[in-house]
Amino acid sequence: QSGIRRLIEFLTAHRLPPELAVRLYRVYGELATDALRDDPYLLTDEYYRADFSQVDAFAIALGVSADDERRVEAGILFELSYNLGAGHTFIPQDKLRTATCALLDLDGEMIDAGMLRLQEQGRMELSQIAGLTACYLPELYEAETYVCRRILSMADGEYPEPGRIDDLVAEIENRQGIDYAPEQRSAIRAAASRQLLIVTGGPGTGKTTV
């Protein structure tokens, strides 16, 4: 208990949330304070979810230089995680560079070097998409490529079109008291003959009825 108390006092003295102490102690035990002094940016890991600006101020107070490789890499990963919170699975490389430059107040060459290191460490993935270089967190790259493979696999096959599709549609119309438009009938026929179909259209165009 005394170890956690000292850790809480250390965190509080540096204006960091004391609730981080339990998770830190769970991982590092009595060596938690030493681990933080060695690499304050470990707090930006998903497990801790510490605020980047607080961690950055903490690191600078401990003597970490503005162009320290750990700071650069943590800033890049923060931007990737931040954009995930906004619903983006990747960021174009030029946008990631610009955002990280602004976050850390560093030039683009340092950010480029940091991105290269993260790639080599397997902590960031790059992919060419529609003429741009997309930057991913590794787990999101794996998830997105898996979804792509599944969609391609589903789209490759075709179900045989039921011979009575028009008769079945007529039965449904009579039973439910609806009258499908020609476009809706076409969508139903397409759905009956494919493993995968995407139905698009604005509000009130009949997607739900199909």
State the predicted function of each range.
Residues 1-210:
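Conserved ATP-binding/catalytic motifs of P-loop helicase motor domains
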